[in-house]
Swiss-Prot record:
Alphabetical UniProt keywords: Ribonucleoprotein, Ribosomal protein
Keyword Cell division among UniProt keywords: no
Single GO cellular component term: cytosolic large ribosomal subunit
The protein's name: Large ribosomal subunit protein bL35
Pfam assignment, any one: Ribosomal_L35p
Keyword check for Iron: no
Species of the source: Psychrobacter arcticus (strain DSM 17307 / VKM B-2377 / 273-4)
Domain of life of the source: Bacteria
Matches recorded under InterPro entries: Ribosomal_bL35 (IPR001706), Ribosomal_bL35-like (IPR021137), Ribosomal_bL35_CS (IPR018265), Ribosomal_bL35_sf (IPR037229)
Family label: Belongs to the bacterial ribosomal protein bL35 family.
GO biological process: translation
A GO molecular function held by the record: structural constituent of ribosome
Name of the gene this protein is made from: rpmI
Length: 65
């Protein structure tokens, strides 16, 4: 009998599976926002897709997502 793989809980909280891959939030938007321009903060608002080169690593960290 094989041992079950463990999900890395930190990664499970950060990534969501979609039909096209994994979506993620953008970095640099949690604190020290006063020195960042409104344009920069606005552009950091949306969700992004995980790059293809990183997808295998995310899949290994979250095998059951």
């Amino acid at each position: 009998m094989k041992v079950k793989m463990k999900t890395r809980s930190g990664a499970a909280k950060r990534f969501k599976k979609t039909a096209n891959g994994f979506k993620r939030k953008q970095a640099f938007k949690s604190h020290i926002l006063t020195k960042k321009s409104a344009k920069r903060i606005r552009q950091l608002r949306g969700l992004k897709m995980v790059d293809k080169s990183d997808e295998a690593a995310v899949r290994r960290m979250c095998p059951y997502i």
